[in-house]
């Protein structure tokens, strides 16, 4: 489940400066850690306002919580900038989402969707709170152990994972290089508008799990 990152407890200058600039112009911001693994945070940033563009999303994964926060905020702000630049006079359909196929479509949808129920749910739900701090043990400190745990988790959910440690002994003290292949997740095309292969088990479809378009599906 997601946890809310307490933006008011950060002592990092980069985080404080970004949040101050956003709040200063009357926008709302919420940061959520949506990662399943505490060693590697995945930060979702939601910025919303009372005028166009109504909402923008940014997401970042990093072994450093602070880096993930800063990158997700930067992405969300960039989306708002692009929304201003690419604004269209055409009204978007907020009831039928068949037209939402590519990433720019998601940008236009949430930029034009005033009082979006999914945005309001993200902004108002009472998530458990965590501080915006570095994790005490990062993936880079014990990568092989973490990879073994992750491979085991994916295997129980029907995903075969093949990986190999490619790190040269003389540079191991600087970090680790691993090659990872998950056949079921390899896209048939690198184009952004082509769906990735998912689990072949008879799980509920995305439309049943979440009726709203999601740029990170």
Model regions and ranges:
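Helix-biased "structured C-terminal domain" signature
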Residues: 1-217
């Amino acid at each position: 489940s997601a946890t809310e990152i307490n933006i008011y407890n950060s002592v990092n200058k980069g985080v404080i400066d970004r949040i101050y600039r956003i709040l200063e112009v009357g926008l709302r911001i919420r940061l959520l850690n949506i990662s399943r693994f505490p060693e590697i945070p995945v930060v979702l940033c939601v910025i919303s306002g009372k005028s166009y563009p109504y909402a923008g999303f940014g997401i970042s994964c990093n072994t450093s919580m602070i880096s993930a926060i800063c990158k997700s905020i930067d992405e969300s702000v960039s989306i708002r900038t692009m929304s201003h630049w690419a604004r269209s006079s055409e009204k978007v359909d907020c009831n039928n989402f068949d037209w939402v196929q590519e990433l720019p479509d998601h940008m236009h949808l949430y930029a034009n969707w005033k009082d979006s129920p999914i945005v309001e749910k993200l902004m108002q739900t009472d998530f458990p709170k965590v501080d915006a701090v570095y994790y005490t043990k990062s993936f880079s400190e014990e990568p092989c152990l973490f990879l073994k745990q992750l491979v085991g988790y994916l295997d129980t959910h029907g995903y075969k994972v093949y990986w190999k440690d490619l790190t040269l002994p003389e540079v191991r003290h600087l970090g680790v290089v691993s090659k990872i292949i998950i056949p079921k997740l390899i896209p048939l095309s690198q184009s952004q508008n082509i769906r990735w292969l998912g689990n072949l088990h008879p799980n509920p479809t995305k439309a049943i799990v979440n009726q709203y378009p999601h740029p990170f599906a």
